[in-house]
Amino acid sequence: MKLIKWLKRYQTVLTFQFIASVLLFYRAHKMNMLPFKYEVILGVILILLWLIMLKLSKPKKRKYRHEKRKKARPAFGKFLSILLSIAMIFASNMLAKTNGAIAKITNVSYETTVISLITLKDKGLDHPKDVNNKTIGINTEVNNSKVSEAVSKLSDKIDFKIKKYNDFANLADALYDHKVSAILIDQSYDTMFLEKHLNFANETQTIWTYKIKVPVSNTRSNIDVTKEPFTILISGVDSRGDVSEKSRSDVDMLVTINPKTHNMLMTSLPRDTFVKISGINGRDKLTHAGLFGTKAVKNTIENFMNIKIDFTARVGFQSVIKIVDALDGIDVYSDKAFTSYADSTIHFVKGTMHMDGRQALAFARERHAYTTGDLHRNQNQIAVMHAILKKVMDPSILANYSDLMDAISGTFQTTLQAGDISALIKMQLNSNPKWNVQHSILAGTSRKRKGGYMMPKTAIYYFIADESSIKQNREYINDIRDGKTVTVANSDANGISQ
């Protein structure tokens, strides 16, 4: 009874509001994203709210001893104060959640390699024990040390024989021809089999996996991202699990930003571009550089384009769905009407279309609807990225900030530091500058040839970049960094260079 009376006192209610106010201000300040003027405004608002609730909640003194006190106003004031306290605590938790999400995406400390034991479906080989005393095939030419580690772990569970192959084509044929009962591979390489076995994903199953975490070292950049130009590599990976899992880089986009001139350039590199892969003695598709880690992709592009990349970001494809939905959709222009090849339930109209997450991902991955295939897909990817950035840079996104943090958590990693992200957000909120965003795509031709590092004896299509286009795109990037304004010619309705 005494506790209830204590809780009903206006002093108690206002004390709760004071504590909630201090907590909210502390969390907002700790985030280091609000410009000073907004912190001052927040502080003034919190003080005014407390004073108003004091005025409403505190009972008036009686002029006469037998005069009745009015209870309606103090009761309403206490009720309103409680609601404000709850709202402030909720907002404080949201800010803490945001800090946690940013800390998670900027803490890139390891990459994960997943080794998978794969069998054909409907063969009665559904568990590791079913492969006991049978033959397992491996590829000894790629990632041999990690596969050997997985072989050792698997041998603790079952007995088996190993048959070695020197390329993925022969390894896949051995599985389909029943020369081996299963194959043990780095999961990120399973797309190698699609060149000869298009339905590999549907015809096989993974019956055992072994994960190996490898520490990665990232040299911290001393760039002040609010004053100095920088280039960030955005690598879209097709990993099925956590974004830390090594996977092909299906999307490779360079975003060059000059915070002083407010110029931004997006440069898209076709995933099949034939390049020398950093760290190995061979050339292959740029997408396959991702199999050796994000650092390999960064170094490969730096050497290929003769440019400097300051930061990297890995984005899981599933995060596109979550991010776009958290932004309440994006508006993107489509130059033709078509039905998604991957999902026949998704249809696109010609013109500007408001897309949800599923539609945006399907649009970004579509190539079958276009005569230029991957090149047009690169244009779509840039269009989606531009639309996302346009939404993210709008101050109104603060209303959806918690949902956005949920979307990127676990599906996004970057070598940008938490302080860098905070500084960029603070800069945008403080001055809300209008950005000049330009887009360009590396030009070239598709040719069928042998000699790729992964499948040297198999003739497949590679994208051979034009030297003139490499030079032009390098100049675009350097011009942005030098403070010049770049205008990319021959752009479509999304502003993308053809």
Where does each model-flagged region fall?
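Membrane-interfacial loop-to-transmembrane-helix junctions in polytopic alpha-helical membrane proteins
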Residues: 5, 9, 34, 66-76, ...
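Cytosolic-side transmembrane helix boundary signature
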Residues: 42-81
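Juxtamembrane transmembrane-helix termini
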Residues: 30, 59-65, 94-97
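Non-catalytic, solvent-exposed segments at the cell envelope interface
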Residues: 106, 110-113, 118-121, 127-128, ...
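Hydrophobic alpha-helical membrane segments
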Residues: 88, 130-133
